[in-house]
Amino acid sequence: MVKPTLVTNRIRALRFAHDEMTQADLAERVGVTRQTVIAIEQERYSPSLEMAFQIARVFGVPLDDVFAYPGDTIPDEGAAS
């Protein structure tokens, strides 16, 4: 069994807010496999800092709108407009 990461994210919500972008579309834009995107979304894998910035750039939002660490708060889904 894979241990979940402490990093949480809003990738799925952001994908749906961006014309229902697929995991494959995001993976292609970031340069990783769809399986990597799935693992990050399910919080089974923490992306590198570089990959985290690339993901945030795809959505046009700051890094902390996508990822949070314990003690941080992730903005509500409606806040990233």
Where in this protein do the model-derived segments appear?
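DNA major-groove recognition helix of helix-turn-helix/homeodomain DNA-binding modules
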Residues: 50-65
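Short basic helix-loop element that most often maps to the first helix and adjoining turn
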Residues: 10-29
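Short, charged recognition helix plus adjacent turn
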Residues: 1, 57, 67-81
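DNA major-groove recognition helix of helix-turn-helix
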Residues: 15, 41, 70
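Recognition helix of helix-turn-helix/homeodomain-like DNA-binding domains
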Residues: 31-46
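Key DNA-contacting residues within the recognition helix of helix-turn-helix
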Residues: 12, 38-39, 67
